[in-house]
């Protein structure tokens, strides 16, 4: 029944959006504005009431803590589009289970998220559960609809990726939209199918004094777990078997096992700006547009006046002489008629006798040339004043951001192999015996209040400054041995500040510090910073960028506490200390980018899994334990990107080298190469 509802809803959506779909070729300009190129001829309305529809879209991202906006580039059907649906990433940098929609992990350590999430089960699915900072808000000149379907394979092993986006603006300040994503991978091996649904809605209001962004998403992820194939020789040495196997015929460790994730997210940030208004000159494009509007208005007024004169002549039974009318209108602006006299009294004799040359209150105009020059200056000043606009300059902002996340994870299994798990802690709840129904819930609410002194409101304000306070409330539910649920609540209060400079062309920097005051995160410290210098070099810009952070943070709740049918732990872990220093050198002219990073981690937390393998290739005695490495781990990463282009030929290369001082704890790929 659910499947029928989904199909019906999809058909209804397609039917509703088809009338507004346009057959256009799209492109974006240097201002990140998406503009359809309509070069084909279109039949016009026979009534002559056609209106030119404005085209274009602007997108941006927002900071998850403060709601600061940053211009972004619109996604287009251009660079690397053919790889955009791959779970492996654009350049194959992720390890996956081979199927669309499976869990994944980035092989490049410096490209992984810096901090552990509160709900670790969704981290391997970051292509569905995206961070707020990656989302593109929209401002469109006219409604935008985009529907995309990528499909491959057949009914047995096929994959489908469907995406539908609609965005619209009520006016130039208020915009909204929605997006629907559906990923379905049947899998190439037994019990490997995946299914992901995601629905997103957003809205934004960008006024001079008040600004707000709202983002809502609800996700459902369902993955079939097979535990891997029973013997790697089916792949590595198929010749040792007397019969051949298709991939979906190779025996797997588990069957009828599902991992389900349901999560909802609400993000809302708004601010009130206090500042002043000032007159600034319009841009060249705005001046051209205003001149065109003024000329059009004048022309329309003249046409209306002529039409009114024509109607009046018709009512009076007279013939309308258009040439005489036009001559009369031109005469109105040709100056004073010949023989015109100046009316008024003659100046008083005492005033006439006054030496005007010695009058400091009057402007001396010597000759006709000087008078003409003065009149020209006055006319130019009057014209220039028309091309200034009022701009509101914010000085101080009062910011509030709230974020609410709700999660549920269910692991449901039937026909679990005998002795597969080492321990069993209880046999109660929804499923018993050889069946498993593990469930955990979590919700998290975070409020942040900030006061900002903004950058650039005058020539002395070279940087922006913010002070903020955040309060976290986290709720968790874990099963008990009696079949019920045990509830946990964690509170955390933190304060911090930010110093940043984003305007200008040569130097930019950003530094944020946050310290935990109370609750489970008391004593935590997070310092993040980056700086970039842009140097003109060989007709282009050489950018040198530095990034660094120091994080002392509490390990995620699920590293410290977890209850399930066959897994159970309650640990008191030390805070993890992670330091990174990274430098980046970029030169667009040679299409070169070099990154070098050094990491040091103390009290690194990870999961350790152990099991035995029988002669038949089955697993027994499976156990998972959270571990913490008290010593330090040093990591080195060096990455070179070098791209080449010759006419229509394009060759992109990325080479990465990594080294870990303790591979038994933090194992990394030593080298990784990708080329397109």
Predicted regions and their residues:
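Intrinsically disordered, low-complexity segments
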Residues: 7-8, 15, 358, 364, ...
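A generic structural signal for short, non-catalytic loop/turn and secondary-structure boundary residues
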Residues: 15, 140-142, 391-393
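Bacterial Sec-dependent N-terminal signal peptides
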Residues: 1-27
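Membrane-proximal, glycine/serine-rich, low-complexity loop/turn segments characteristic
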Residues: 23-267, 271-323, 327-346, 351, ...
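Exposed, low-structure sequence patches enriched in small/polar residues
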Residues: 216, 252-314, 319, 368-672, ...
């Amino acid at each position: 029944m659910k499947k029928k509802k989904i199909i019906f809803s999809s058909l209804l959506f397609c039917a509703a959006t088809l009338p507004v779909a346009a057959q256009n070729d799209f492109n974006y300009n240097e201002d990140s504005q998406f503009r359809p190129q309509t070069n084909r001829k279109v039949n016009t309305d026979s009534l002559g009431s056609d209106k030119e529809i404005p085209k274009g879209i602007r997108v941006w991202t927002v900071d998850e803590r403060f709601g600061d906006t940053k211009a972004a580039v619109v996604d287009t059907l251009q660079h690397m589009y053919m790889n955009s649906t791959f779970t492996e990433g654009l350049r194959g940098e992720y390890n996956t289970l081979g199927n669309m929609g499976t869990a994944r992990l980035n092989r490049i350590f410096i490209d992984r998220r810096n901090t552990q999430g509160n709900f670790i089960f969704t981290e391997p699915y970051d292509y569905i559960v995206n961070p707020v900072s990656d989302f593109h808000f929209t401002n469109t000149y006219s409604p935008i609809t985009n529907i995309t379907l990528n499909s491959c394979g057949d009914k047995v092993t096929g994959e489908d990726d469907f995406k539908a986006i609609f965005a619209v603006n009520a006016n130039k300040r208020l915009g909204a939209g929605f997006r629907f994503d559906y990923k379905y991978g049947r899998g190439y091996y037994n019990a490997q199918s995946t299914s992901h649904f995601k629905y997103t809605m957003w809205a934004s209001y960008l006024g001079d004094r008040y600004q707000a962004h709202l983002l809502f998403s609800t996700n459902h992820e369902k993955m079939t777990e097979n535990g891997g194939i029973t013997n790697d020789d089916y792949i590595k040495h198929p010749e040792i078997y007397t019969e051949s196997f298709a991939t979906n015929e190779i025996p797997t460790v588990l069957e009828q096992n599902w991992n389900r994730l349901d999560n909802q997210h609400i993000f809302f940030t708004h601010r009130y700006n206090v500042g002043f208004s000032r007159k600034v000159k319009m841009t060249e494009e705005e001046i051209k547009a205003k001149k065109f509007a003024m000329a059009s208005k004048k022309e329309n007024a003249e046409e209306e006046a002529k039409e009114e004169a024509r109607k009046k002549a018709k009512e009076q039974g007279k013939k309308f002489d258009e040439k005489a009318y036009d001559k009369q209108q031109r005469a109105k602006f040709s100056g004073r008629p010949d023989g015109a006299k100046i009316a008024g009294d003659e100046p008083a004799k005492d005033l006439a006798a006054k030496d005007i040359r010695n009058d400091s209150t009057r402007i001396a105009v010597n000759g006709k040339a000087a008078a003409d020059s003065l009149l020209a200056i006055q006319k130019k000043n009057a014209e220039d004043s028309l091309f200034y606009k009022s701009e509101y300059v914010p000085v101080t902002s009062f910011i509030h951001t709230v974020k609410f996340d709700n999660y549920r994870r269910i692991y449901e299994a039937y026909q679990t192999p005998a002795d597969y798990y080492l321990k069993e802690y209880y046999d109660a709840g929804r499923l018993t015996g050889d069946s498993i129904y593990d469930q955990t819930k979590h919700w998290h609410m975070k409020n942040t209040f900030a006061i900002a002194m903004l950058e650039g409101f005058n020539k002395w304000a070279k940087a922006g400054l913010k002070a903020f306070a955040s309060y976290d409330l986290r709720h968790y539910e874990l099963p008990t041995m009696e079949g019920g649920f045990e509830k946990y609540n964690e509170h955390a209060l933190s304060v911090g500040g930010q110093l940043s400079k984003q305007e200008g062309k040569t130097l930019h920097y950003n530094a944020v510090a946050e310290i935990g005051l109370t609750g489970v995160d008391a004593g935590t410290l997070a310092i993040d910073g980056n700086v970039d210098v842009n140097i003109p070099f060989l007709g282009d810009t050489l950018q040198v960028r530095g990034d660094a952070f120091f994080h002392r943070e509490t390990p995620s709740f699920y590293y410290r506490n977890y209850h399930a049918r066959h897994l159970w732990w309650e640990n008191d872990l030390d805070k993890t200390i992670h330091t990174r220093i990274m430098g980046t050198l970029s030169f667009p002219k040679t299409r070169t980018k070099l990154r070098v990073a050094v990491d040091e981690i103390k009290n690194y937390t990870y999961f350790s899994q152990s099991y035995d393998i029988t002669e038949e290739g089955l697993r027994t005695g499976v156990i998972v334990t959270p571990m913490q490495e008290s010593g330090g781990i040093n990591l080195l990463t060096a990455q070179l990107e070098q791209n080449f282009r010759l006419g229509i030929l394009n060759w992109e290369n990325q080479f990465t080298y990594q080294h870990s001082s303790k591979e038994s704890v933090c194992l990394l790929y030593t080298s990784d190469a990708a080329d397109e």
